[in-house]
Amino acid sequence: CTGAILLAAAGLLKGRRATTHWLALDVLGRFGAEPTGERVVTDGKYVTAAGVSSGIDMGLTLLGRIAGDDHARAVQLLTEYDPQPPYDAGSPEKAPAHLVEEFRGRSRFILT
């Protein structure tokens, strides 16, 4: 969920658009990256993803770049990756405000 922070801390994302889990998104900016709330971000040779489920999106994105769109579509089909979540609360913008605030209050993504 937060692997992009390692890239940012190493200085590899300075001045680049990037994403990570929404609870740690502001940390990217502290290391010079340009945080965005998108699920998958490609900037140059770097591809970053938000929370754990967006890792599948990132994998398909990379596969498309490496092996072609048809191959990525075939893998998506064979794995039956067709997200239909039972709740529409997969981002802070969609989730109930009390849940967002609860998790922000308990967040451990604190760097000094």
Question: PLM ranges: what are they?
Answer:
Residues 2-112:
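Active-site-adjacent pocket-lining segments in enzyme domains
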